[in-house]
């Protein structure tokens, strides 16, 4: 059975957010674009919250988990529409699983046809996934993760990947404030609590976000 806890999505989202901001800055994008990428980073997997609810409601249904996993970018895109986020943020989220060689999803876009925000998120998302513990494996070290990504570099924009290597080894990264995203996350926590789906770690979810981004 699939399970995506809100705690896991918050932590992963913040890690991707900060890396996306730093990578955009390393690539020379203006501050506003870097900030927009930080928003997209923290929300890029928000569709998994919807996915969790759907799968948990289908307790007796046998599902092909990968098929459902691959719907999360579209679910996230749809969830965030009408909430005041820019087209840039929404498209970055929708296409963050597209591979540079055209083998990704949901639209099999390739090369420059993939929005540059999505290309940035792709790199940061993969790195954060590799350097995090999973039920079936321990986290890879920074060096191991970069080696694995280099072996699959066809999936990434090469210029961005080289810039990402510089970011990872710079040692000058720091967390940034995203107060409007903070409010959305709090809304989702509130909705899940009211619907009786609150995790036992729910309080720590909010505390983690507040500590990393300042008081609301």
Regions found by a protein language model. Name each.
Residues 215-216:
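Short, low-complexity N-terminal regulatory "tails/caps" that precede and couple sensory modules
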Residues 1-212:
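Histidine- and acidic-residue-rich, metal-dependent catalytic cores
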